[in-house]
Amino acid sequence: EPVNGPLGVQLAVQVVPNPVITQVVLEPEDNKIEPQVIEDTFSSDYGRTLNLNELQLRMKELQRWYSSNGYSLARVSGPTRVSPDGVVQLKVLIGTVAGVEVKFLNKEGEDTNEKEEPIKGKTKPWVVSREISIKPGEPFNRTQLESDIRRLYGTSLFSDVKVTLRPVTGEPGFITIVLGIVEQSTGSLSGGLGYSQSQGVFGQVQLSDSNLFGRAWDLALNITYGQFGGLANLTFTDPWIKGDNHRTSFRTSVFLSREVPQVFQSQNDGDIVSLRDYEDNNSKYAYSIDSKKNPADSRFNNVSKAGNEFPETSWFDYEGDSIALERVGGNIIFSRPLNGGDPFKKVPWQVLAGLNLQAVRPINYAGGTRPYGIPRDKIKNDRIENDEIICTSFDCADRNTLASVRLAATYNTLNDGRNPTSGNFFSFGTEQYVSIGENSPTFNRVRTSYTHFIPVKWLKLAKGCRPKEGEPENCPQALAFQIKA
């Protein structure tokens, strides 16, 4: 302030020290930072006179905390107010999501075609947006968005996802997330040759579309024909029922298969073959109707005639074909993770429930019903011990109906679903078959398995196991232990 003096007017400057810091407050209250972080950052300044230069350094520390926790748009400014009792108020502008837009791009990354019209994607926009956990009105978090992008890639529907953050005009701190989606081909026709223990050498043709009607539905037709049978299977899968917060999936299939059971391939070196007919009259031996080496010293045209004339003797009509099982049926399966209604929460537990219905018929290669089989090497002098005759179906029926309810649960803590090196995988399932009529058996089947992976670094054969200086190591190795029952 000016003061009159003997030499003229003097300017007196009155210096008032900053108050002693007692507390630092961030505004607004919903600032996403934990109180302990604020305490740890400013605790060394409490009880000391406010120094604005040091305050700026502390604000940069807060800025780094926000950035390291994914809030890359957050800005800390101030102080906006310093009270006489030492309360310092800082302002935090985190960055708020105003909305999420989906744009479809071509392979060149353009969102319009030659006619300057927007690219129309096959996928429904809600299939994309439902994988995005950041909602309008929530703070923008880079880490959260990266997880959302990984989920989009996990659908296997998109070859590229480009992210653009567009500021909202007239609304500072608000941004719109623009997702540029490049779709990949989801329809396929494939074929090949292979070998399996159940089918032997086989050929396979598969026709599928994993984005049916743009709703992420998967429809697949698989036809396999092999050395020991064939299979036709039509499967429909909805990986996430629309509108379900539990992320419930649905799968159904219908199938027709004909294959030689593994037990018939391996037992007696695959020597179990078919009988056209068989009549058990509780005798010690069963005799072939095609030979005279029997109590009647005569051949017969059919088993019924032989049984009528010699009712105390068991008879069989030998055919000699391999025995296959024809299965016609379908199933319905629902599964969901135990996420408590949060579709974006990663949880180890998943449960499954399903229904299965199928008709099973033992047949020869011509498709004729063959409920009886015989070990060929046990036939001596055109007869066989009666106890050696095999029922190839339940109760030796021409057809069995199998109806079951299936319940299962899995626990998965693997670090990588495709190439795990650590973690555990446990599964438990039970399938209860119930009788729904004649020749429909009742029984239960229980299966369980446990696998444990231990990471190791024993071999250095792969190039990724011998990285040069500055290169990342890529050397996944593990020991796996598995128990099944």
Which sequence ranges carry the predicted segments?
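Periplasmic polypeptide-binding modules associated with outer-membrane biogenesis and secretion
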Residues: 1-201, 205-206, 220-240, 355-358, ...
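C-terminal outer-membrane beta-barrel translocator/porin domains of Gram-negative envelope proteins
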Residues: 368-485
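Short acidic, glycine/proline-enriched loop segments that cap or flank alpha-helices
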Residues: 50-53, 318, 416, 438
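Short regulatory "switch" loops immediately downstream of catalytic or recognition motifs
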Residues: 101-114, 257-271, 275, 337-340, ...
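Gram-negative/organellar outer-membrane beta-barrel architecture
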Residues: 31-36, 63, 75, 118-126, ...
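Conserved long hydrophobic alpha-helices within structured protein cores
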Residues: 101-102, 250-254, 330, 440-452
